[in-house]
Structures are given as C-alpha cells and as structure tokens.
C-alpha cells in the first residue's frame, strides 16, 4: 500500500470537513406560487390578473410569470399579456413575518386594442413584499414598471397587485 504524504493527508482532511460543513449548513431551495389580482394605471385604471411560479435560494430568486391586463375597447384601454422571467434579490430571512424583494426581468408581450396588436419584447423592474399569514400562506404585494420595445400604444406600463402566495 502506498503511503499518503502527511501534507496531502491534512489537505484531504480539511477539504472533506469543509465540504461536509457546507453541505450541512446549506439552505434548501424554496419554491412558491402566486395567484394575483391588481390594477394598472396605464393609461388609466384597469384590471390585471395572473400567476407566478418562483424558486428562491438564500438571497437570489428566479420567477416566471404570466399576467393579463384586460382590454376595454369602450374606454380605448389596450389589453396586455406578458410572459416574463425575473431575477429577485430578497432578504434572506423574514423580518416581522415580511420578506422584501427587488426584481428585474425580461418579457415577451402582446398588446391589443380591437384589431390593432403589437407583439415584441420588453424589460421590467419592481419590488414588493411577501407577508406571512398562516403556515406557508402569505400575501404578496408587488409593484412593477414594464418598458416595452417595438411600437406599442404605450411604451411604459405600471402595475400593482395583491396576491395569494403559497410557499413550499
């Protein structure tokens, strides 16, 4: 049997203990799902609804979201559907039952009003809070600003929503 030099044995021991410590202290990934209702003031108040699915690590999270801003042809308010992927930077722990976050992402969108439509891409930024209610159930408050590329009727949309969030 070949002997392992003393310096190598120390390195292997330190490496093994480091990997064991990191594995034992690693925070598990957390997922959540949100169903929401909200309002957009662009160009004037009208309803929005949608859902999101997210995965959070300690501070960084990822989210995929679908939202539908209803069209009102009588009031000449365009409809907007977005499919977005976002990165969240969030507080690692809840403070007084509240987890705060900031988000940025990119989306594909379709804006419609009657026969007119525009399909293109855009970006969004925003932030919000997830507030613990009972067990894994939380209320989510979210504000976003969407910047649409191409030739939309409105190049910037704002949105505020309140959602039911389930953490698992």
Regions found by a protein language model. Give the residues of each.
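Cleavable N-terminal export/targeting peptides
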Residues: 1-32
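Transmembrane beta-strand segments of Gram-negative outer membrane beta-barrel proteins
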Residues: 30-39, 100-104
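Extracytoplasmic loops and strand-loop junctions of Gram-negative outer membrane beta-barrel proteins
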Residues: 34-36, 109-111, 147
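Active-site beta-loop-alpha junctions enriched in small/polar residues
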Residues: 40, 67, 146
């Amino acid at each position: 049997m070949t002997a392992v030099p003393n310096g190598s044995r120390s390195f292997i021991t330190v490496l093994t203990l480091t990997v064991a410590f990191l594995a034992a202290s690693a925070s598990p990934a957390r997922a959540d799902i949100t169903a929401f209702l909200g309002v957009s003031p662009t160009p004037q108040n009208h309803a929005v609804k949608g859902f999101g699915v997210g995965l959070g690590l300690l501070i960084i999270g990822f989210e995929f979201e679908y939202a539908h801003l209803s069209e009102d042809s009588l009031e000449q308010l365009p409809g907007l559907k977005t499919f977005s992927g976002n990165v969240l930077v969030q507080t690692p722990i809840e403070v007084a039952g509240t987890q705060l976050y900031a988000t940025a992402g990119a989306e594909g969108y379709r804006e419609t009003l009657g026969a007119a439509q525009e399909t293109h891409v855009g970006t969004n930024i925003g932030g919000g809070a997830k507030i613990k209610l009972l067990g894994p159930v939380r209320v989510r408050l979210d504000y976003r600003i969407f910047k649409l590329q191409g030739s939309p009727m409105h190049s910037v949309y704002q949105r505020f929503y309140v959602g039911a969030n389930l953490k698992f």
